Curated annotation (Swiss-Prot):
Family: Belongs to the complex I 49 kDa subunit family.
Recorded superkingdom: Eukaryota
Protein's recorded name: NAD(P)H-quinone oxidoreductase subunit H, chloroplastic
Complex formation: NDH is composed of at least 16 different subunits, 5 of which are encoded in the nucleus.
Gene: ndhH
NCBIfam families attached to this UniProt entry: PRK06075.1, PRK07415.1
SUPFAM superfamilies, per database record: HydB/Nqo4-like
Organism: Zygnema circumcarinatum
GO molecular-function terms, A-Z: NAD binding; oxidoreductase activity, acting on NAD(P)H, quinone or similar compound as acceptor; quinone binding
Length: 393
């Protein structure tokens, strides 16, 4: 006699599951092998990053921000210095802007590589994981030569970067670009037309165009659903508008489309790096002068007066944030990374609100999982690309 179980089964996946990409817990309700409900449990890696910012100067806070998305630390550093720069009207030298752009794109490639390897391992293909570590090591060698650190670089500064590029670094980076492009083609030959891979990703976790916009998705999650939205084109920050490159996008909206977008972005990042390395200008790599509106409380100050402040390179609090508010965003590998900064005419920010892309993108996960098979959970979660350091903050 066949005994059937009518009651649904509740399974707790994580926070110590090897495919969880961090300390994420999913409380999954199963009806046989089908997912009936899913409740993500967050907060295991919450460290109060926004509150810490209120008692630190920007320079003192820089080492903390590399612990948000610890696989793409250049972007968290960029947003941390961009917010005070915009608030205080600090002009970044062109050479510093080009150096930042090169570092950001190298960090984007490293982040996408470390997404590709574990994503394929989750599906069951172990080989690409070892391939991507080989190329990622070369990027970390470039970071170490320029910043002194392989991870947690602490390289960006208000008004520029900490140090100039060392002698021979540009040639070494160009050599890496020439080496890396054929490797991306090799990944595609290994993966893209593999019938087992296609069965696991095609038509899985489909997000429509309107749905992606309504959920506030960003980055590859949004562009894989047919929306050509890239902040490097939209906001024209740094010097991206001076280079020739294309926004990678797909219309499928499934896990396969998100894979194709990230593969294409690695190619475009190499194109950006090659152009930037050949066009990088000379000149200073930092500007330590802040040009802000003079306070009306000062005597003899007119409406068009400017007050010049010196930005110290030491952690000592010499740079005051104006009493204004500003929202700054950059196109991180996982989506729109933003900071809403409120200054209070003091060395410390009054409010430092972080808009992490992984946290917003993760909200759609329960809707994607309902009705899918248990084995598809890892595929869909892996295609979102989350890092719990920035999700929990």
């Amino acid at each position: 006699m066949l005994i059937t179980k009518a009651d649904p089964m509740v399974v707790s996946m994580g926070p110590h599951h090897p495919s969880m990409h961090g300390v994420l817990r999913l409380i999954v309700t199963l009806d046989g092998e089908n997912v009936a409900d899913c409740e993500p449990v967050l907060g295991y890696l919450h460290r109060g990053m926004e509150k810490i910012a209120e008692s630190r100067t920007t320079l003192q806070y820089l080492p903390y921000v590399t612990r948000w998305d610890y696989l793409a630390t250049m972007f968290t550093e960029a947003i941390t210095v961009n917010a005070p720069e915009r608030l205080a009207n600090i002009q970044v030298p062109k050479r510093a802007s080009y150096i930042r752009m090169i570092m950001l794109e190298l960090s984007r490639i490293a982040s996408h590589l470390l997404w590709l390897g574990p994503f394929m391992a989750d599906i069951g293909a172990q080989t690409p994981f070892f391939y991507i570590l080989r190329e990622r090591e070369m990027i970390y060698d470039l970071f170490e030569a320029a910043t002194g650190m392989r991870m947690m670089h602490n390289y960006f500064r208000i008004g520029g970067v900490a140090v100039d590029l060392p002698y021979g670094w540009v040639d070494k980076c160009l050599d890496f670009c020439d080496y890396f492009l054929p490797k991306v083609n090799e990944y595609e030959r290994l993966i893209t037309r593999n019938p087992i891979f296609l069965k696991r990703v095609e038509g899985i976790g489909v997000i429509g165009r309107e749905e992606a916009i309504n959920w506030g998705l960003s980055g590859p999650m949004l562009r894989a659903s047919g929306v050509q939205w890239d902040l490097r084109k939209v906001d024209r920050y740094e010097c991206y508008h001076e280079l020739d490159w294309q926004v990678e996008w797909q219309s499928g909206g499934d896990c396969f489309a998100r894979y194709l977008v990230r593969i294409g972005e690695m190619r475009e990042s190499v194109t950006i790096i090659q152009q930037a390395l050949k066009a990088i200008p000379g000149g200073p790599y930092e500007n330590l002068e802040a040009r802000r509106m003079a306070s009306m409380a000062q005597k003899n100050s007119q409406w068009n007066d400017f007050e010049y402040q010196f930005v110290s390179k030491k952690p000592s609090p010499t740079f005051k944030l104006p009493k204004q508010e500003h929202y700054v965003r950059v196109e991180a590998p996982k989506g729109e990374l933003g900071v809403f900064l409120i200054g209070d005419d003091s060395m410390f920010p009054w409010r430092w609100k972080i808009r992490p892309p992984g946290f917003i993108n993760l909200q759609i996960l329960p809707q994607l999982l309902i009705g899918m098979k248990l084995a598809d959970i890892m595929t869909i979660l892996g295609s979102i690309d989350i890092i719990m350091g920035e999700v929990d903050r």
